[in-house]
């Protein structure tokens, strides 16, 4: 399964919104440096989708706000 995410780093509070099926807007409080925001996005996706973090892989957009994640079965 492929999930698209629009990330908003340095937010005042963390939030995850499902814009449409398999497309999320995620706000994280951490800065976009040294992979901190990406790690936090994976943690939030994991909790929201109720799956282990190890099943979520960043496929595209490591340094972009628009990201594509693969959920591994």
Swiss-Prot record:
InterPro entries in the cross-refs:
DUF167, YggU-like_sf
Q: Which GO terms describe its cellular component?
A: cytoplasm
Q: Where does the source fall among the domains of life?
A: Bacteria
One Pfam family this sequence matches: DUF167
Q: Into which family does the record put it?
A: Belongs to the UPF0235 family.
Record-given protein name? UPF0235 protein PERMA_1406
Instruction: Tell me which species this is from.
Output: Persephonella marina (strain DSM 14350 / EX-H1)
Q: Please spell out the taxonomic lineage of the organism that makes this protein.
A: Bacteria, Pseudomonadati, Aquificota, Aquificia, Aquificales
